[in-house]
Amino acid sequence: MILNIGLIDYGMGNLHSVEQSFKRLNQSLKIISGPNDLSNCDALILPGVGSFDPAMKNLQQTNLIPELKKWVLNNKPLLGICLGLQLLFESSDEGKSKGLGLLKGTIKHLPKSEKQLIPHMGWAELNQDKECPLFKSNSSPQWMYFVHSYSAIPSDKNDIASSVNFGDEKITAVVWKKKLAACQFHPEKSGRSGELLLSNWLAWLKKETKDLY
């Protein structure tokens, strides 16, 4: 089955790395720069590198915000990556702009810790908090690559699919709600573990898409 997956380009994402990760999985991506590019897409990817306010400003300029809200409201698959996860929430301590509000909750600065440096940069082992199509039940613990200073605080803790230890606390690593998924880490920079996660998402997506036809 051939999937049509859109990669949103709003000037704040590491598009090349994401494209290359999916290319290794024999999956091409279609660049989405505006509403007219969304036709025939089965799923969307919202990447992100940088700060919250400039990201929301750039996204606003693409005229994609109403379309993204309709996309998720219609229960279509979307995958957020790093800053892309944070934009899904209502607000962020990093800026004054409103987020997309597709998930209830906010983005907070990482808690100060004598055991951890900020920004949180490097490899960390995931804790699986609930069953999620991004992870296989019999898989070994996954290590992913993080680069961030802020983390999501979902209003509904059931939205958290995976967390990671940070000092004496746990912070959000993966959210999953209906067909909306997002990860704080960079799967495209996480070697075999990241590749496996993206492969699991594609397998789930193919099943979901097949069931529609």
Curated annotation (Swiss-Prot):
Residues annotated as signal peptide: none
Active site: C82, H186, E188
Residue ranges of domain Glutamine amidotransferase type-1 in the record: 4-211
Protein name (record): Imidazole glycerol phosphate synthase subunit HisH
Catalysed conversion reaction: 5-[(5-phospho-1-deoxy-D-ribulos-1-ylimino)methylamino]-1-(5-phospho-beta-D-ribosyl)imidazole-4-carboxamide + L-glutamine = D-erythro-1-(imidazol-4-yl)glycerol 3-phosphate + 5-amino-1-(5-phospho-beta-D-ribosyl)imidazole-4-carboxamide + L-glutamate + H(+); L-glutamine + H2O = L-glutamate + NH4(+)
Function: IGPS catalyzes the conversion of PRFAR and glutamine to IGP, AICAR and glutamate. The HisH subunit catalyzes the hydrolysis of glutamine to glutamate and ammonia as part of the synthesis of IGP and AICAR. The resulting ammonia molecule is channeled to the active site of HisF.
Subcellular location: Cytoplasm
Source lineage: Bacteria, Bacillati, Cyanobacteriota, Cyanophyceae, Synechococcales
GO terms for cellular component: cytoplasm
Pfam family, one: GATase
